[in-house]
Amino acid sequence: MEIFITGLLLGASLLLSIGPQNVLVIKQGIKREGLIAVLLVCLISDVFLFIAGTLGVDLLSNAAPIVLDIMRWGGIAYLLWFAVMAAKDAMTNKVEAPQIIEETEPTVPDDTPLGGSAVATDTRNRVRVEVSVDKQRVWVKPMLMAIVLTWLNPNAYLDAFVFIGGVGAQYGDTGRWIFAAGAFAASLIWFPLVGFGAAALSRPLSSPKVWRWINVVVAVVMTALAIKLMLMG
């Protein structure tokens, strides 16, 4: 149980920093749009990354130690780029805050042709079908963005191999899997908490002023994480 708790705490410490995934989860929670798809991508990705990190850390560090350095510097570049984008958004006069998706009843024009009760009903049905199709597709873009921000983020591999795999390796063959399970438990708690919490607070969090400050915090945290990675070398 102690190993599990240690993994849980390490996983939580990695998640507490405002990273690209967290920002996306918050934004989609505020929009109430594609949140479940984003959460599933984040959680399923963590399963594969933690398994890869637990299995591959010894092989990678012994066979190709330079790969860890490449991932570290790639993570630094990625974090600095994300920090610059957040700072740019914070400094612009018009900050684009996520908008809440309101559900509205489709309307039919008043000039419906005579005898148009059936026509109006048919029109409403067609509009409802179109709205339903749009709602079905609305999760695709956030899901693809979650995949990109997870799997093209060098820092994700660094966390999986160096922190989850590297620290977990000291607990032996069985203990490292318990450690990884604890780290995943942190993800299982964190992502839904952040996403649904953002949805519950969507109205105050939709303010451009609030998002200007969020972008400032994101820029500072991303820069601090990049500096921390530099010092690890």
UniProtKB/Swiss-Prot annotation:
Residues 24-65, 165-176 are periplasmic. Signal peptide: none annotated. Disruption phenotype: Null mutant is unable to excrete L-lysine. Deletion of lysEG decreases the extracellular accumulation of L-lysine, L-arginine and L-citrulline. Keywords: Amino-acid transport, Cell inner membrane, Cell membrane, Membrane, Transmembrane, Transmembrane helix, Transport. It is found in: Cell inner membrane. Residues 1-2, 87-143, 198-212 are cytoplasmic. The chain crosses the membrane at residues 3-23, 66-86, 144-164, 177-197, 213-233. Pfam families: LysE. Induction: Positively regulated by LysG. Belongs to the LysE/ArgO transporter (TC 2.A.75) family. This is Lysine exporter LysE. It comes from Corynebacterium glutamicum (strain ATCC 13032 / DSM 20300 / JCM 1318 / BCRC 11384 / CCUG 27702 / LMG 3730 / NBRC 12168 / NCIMB 10025 / NRRL B-2784 / 534). The lineage of its organism: Bacteria, Bacillati, Actinomycetota, Actinomycetes, Mycobacteriales.
